[in-house]
């Protein structure tokens, strides 16, 4: 069974569909039952010879007991791949004390971006250890490698994922378990509020297919060739230039939001 969190939208949904295309049984985790039912139906309509299970979990509201119940359900099956995809971002770029929603939003971003990847990984590793086999894919972001003004908490939580996974690689390198970080740049999803795909901003289906092909070949990758090219080039760019790029990106996102409100 292959587990995908945040599995009913964007990259997560695309991961689930592509894993199903490859013939794997899927365990979907998301917060909205209607979307889970719809995604399960869509998968089975295309790939009727696989099994699809799901669990409802809102990671902004989940309690310790909720995590225990979820892990109990997950450990009832053999899990070959865990894709920790669920994530949350601010609606708009803003300095820390002015983030829309205030402390509630900041708490949600921290809870969604850090706790699931940590606790689900810890809860599923024992069965992978027993089999000496398993794959854990943690979805971060290139935002975790750049000091992104007006995205402070989001960027920091993505850095956590990168650091966390690199340590797991050291801890489990002799246990038959692959731990991989995916750090994409812009992907056309609802999270980034940008519906337009391009060669440098692929749609989620193209991205998921590409990134799944990197498993076992790279411990840390952007998951997509044009993203990797950009990421390697960024290493040679002075930080002052990167800051200007981030500022321009923030302005574009704000303009996009304003245009949506005018429609």
Swiss-Prot record:
Keywords: Lipid biosynthesis, Lipid metabolism, NADP, Oxidoreductase, Steroid biosynthesis. PANTHER family: STEROID DEHYDROGENASE 1-RELATED, VERY-LONG-CHAIN 3-OXOOACYL-COA REDUCTASE. Its EC number is 1.1.1.-. This is Putative steroid dehydrogenase 4. GO terms for cellular component: endoplasmic reticulum. InterPro entries: NAD(P)-bd_dom_sf, Sc_DH/Rdtase_CS, SDR_fam. GO terms for biological process: fatty acid elongation; steroid biosynthetic process. The active site is at residue 154. One of its GO terms (molecular function) is oxidoreductase activity. Belongs to the short-chain dehydrogenases/reductases (SDR) family. 17-beta-HSD 3 subfamily. Gene3D superfamilies: NAD(P)-binding Rossmann-like Domain. Transmembrane segments: none annotated. It is an enzyme of class 1 (oxidoreductase).
